[in-house]
Curated annotation (Swiss-Prot):
Residues 183-195, 359-372 have a biased composition (Polar residues). Negatively regulates proliferation of neuronal precursor cells, thereby controlling the timing of postembryonic neurogenesis. Residues 1-33 form the signal peptide. It comes from Drosophila melanogaster. Its main location: secreted. Residues 390-400, 437-474 have a biased composition (Basic residues). The keyword Signal applies. Keywords: Developmental protein, Differentiation, Glycoprotein, Neurogenesis, Secreted, Signal. This is Protein anachronism.
Length: 474
């Protein structure tokens, strides 16, 4: 009995051992742990290798996937390099995008038609040497003097639009003995500031003396006997003042550009041949305050042939690097034409400028400047009433007819704008005659030959545009 009980207990203990061994084997098979070096273990700290993608482990330690990834990045140096490389690539992409945007903005600004984004050009030129401008006797003894400029100075290139045009003349005092060489002038008296603003005490300024009126006209024909002119601008200044005088002659350049385009069209076949008009010639006349004719050569320095056709732009003399060289250098007192061009802008903006306006610049503190404030409102209004119906009819006709091409329509628009500018400046075209009679007969009416020429030119445009619909119907 006792032996039977002992045998049963042994069997039970063996069964328990077998079950324990089987359970240990099963647990060892399920475990994926790798052996660790005992040196890595710290007393009181247990380490356990877990699978980061095991949700049970995440829930057990209350961790998120972002936290597991951050732990892996800190522990794995290879993954740390990959993250740094990706951040560098993102930074380089951002820099490249910013540079591309900057380049795109610069290119867009360069090709835009806005005035701020367009390039500006400046030209300057001295008169061309001919018998009238280079003969000292004609300049000092003639009742009027002429200046001829080369077409390369005032003709624009690459569709540049005219911004400003100034005729600069050096005013001399005929009653004062000139100590300097009449052909050269020191750069020290030249100043762009108003002498009245620089003087500390206005009471020291002498009273304004006799005044003279300078008239700049556009010459239409080369021959003296048949020469015709058209007033471009006038300016009033003191008779005793000395220094540079600036007169706006933008209306002259608008007329020259129009005549230049007409001459180019006449060179083409099947074009009507009109009377050739000269371009680039300006006439200067001087009158006193009682309308008596004076000699311009006594008040302005003449040009000479020792000067080239192309002059240094006026703005160059104002630059700081150039001022240091002007201390021992003299500036020529020759008549000059300074022109400023803008980039490709609209036609209307290029010719939309103040009418009959002159900017006078004096270089003597004792010679205050006087603006051009001649009262010609009545004459201007009468000219506008005569010219307004013709321009309105032309615009109405061009708006209802389709032009042959965009370039021709642009040329027609430019011609109309130029005619408006010329009519606003002056429409008094007449034969050369004494100046006293010139102002006595000065009215707002056109010359009969000029009216006939305008009527013929306007009728030719109507015939040209009426042919277009007939051609399309065929």
């Amino acid at each position: 009995m006792a032996s039977a009980m002992r045998g049963e207990k042994c069997e039970r203990s063996r069964i328990r051992e077998l079950v324990l061994i089987l359970s240990l084997i099963t647990m060892a098979g399920d475990s994926r742990a790798t052996p660790f070096d005992p040196s890595f273990f710290i007393e009181g700290v247990q380490s356990e290798v877990v699978n980061p993608f095991n949700r049970t482990i995440l829930n057990r330690f209350n961790l998120t996937e972002e936290q597991i990834l951050s732990i892996q990045n800190r522990s794995n140096p290879n993954m740390r390099d990959d993250s740094a490389q990706s951040s560098n690539q993102q930074y380089l992409q951002q820099v490249a995008t910013q540079r591309l945007n900057d380049i795109f903005k610069r290119v867009q600004k360069a090709i835009s038609n806005e005035p701020n984004g367009s390039a500006s050009k400046e030209k300057a030129g001295f008169p061309i040497c001919n018998a009238e401008t280079t003969n000292p006797e004609d300049w000092s003894l003639g009742n009027n003097v002429t200046l001829q400029f080369a077409s390369s100075v005032f003709i624009s290139n690459n569709d540049d639009r005219l911004s400003s045009a100034l005729l600069r003349l050096y005013k001399t005092n005929p009653g004062q003995t000139r100590e300097h060489n009449p052909g050269q002038a020191s750069t020290q008296p030249i100043s762009t500031e108003n002498p009245g603003n620089t003087a500390p005490n206005c009471a020291e300024q002498p009273p304004v003396g006799p005044q003279i009126r300078v008239t700049v006209s556009i010459v239409h024909q080369q021959r003296k006997k048949q020469r015709k002119k058209r007033t471009c601008n006038t300016a009033m200044l003191s008779s005793s003042s000395t220094g540079w005088v600036e007169i706006d002659v933008k209306c002259a350049l608008a007329y020259w550009e129009q005549q230049h385009r007409q001459q180019l069209r006449q060179q083409q076949p099947l074009q009507p041949q009109l009377t050739a008009s000269v371009v680039g010639i300006l006439m200067i006349e001087v009158h006193d305050d009682e309308e008596n004719l004076l000699r311009p050569g006594l008040y302005f320095a003449p040009p000479t042939c020792d000067q080239a056709d192309i002059a240094v732009p006026w703005s160059v003399y104002r630059t700081e690097p150039f001022k240091s060289h002007l201390a021992s250098w003299t500036l020529p007192r020759k008549p000059r034409l300074d022109i400023f061009f803008n980039g490709s802008n609209s036609m209307k903006n290029s010719y939309n400028t103040p009418k009959s306006r002159a900017f006078i610049e004096s270089t003597t503190s004792n010679s205050p400047t006087i603006d051009n404030q001649l009262d010609e409102s009545g004459e201007y209004e009468s000219q506008q009433r005569v010219h307004a119906p013709l321009v309105h009819h032309r615009r109405h006709h061009h708006n209802h007819q389709q032009p042959e091409s965009e370039s021709e329509s642009a040329q027609l628009e430019a011609e109309i704008e130029a005619e408006e500018l010329m009519s606003s400046a002056s429409n008094s075209e007449q034969q050369m005659e004494p100046i006293s009679n010139h102002h006595r007969h000065r009215t707002g009416h056109h010359h009969p030959h000029h009216q006939l020429h305008q009527h013929h030119h306007h009728h030719h445009r109507h015939t040209k545009h009426h042919r277009i619909p007939a051609h399309k119907q065929e």
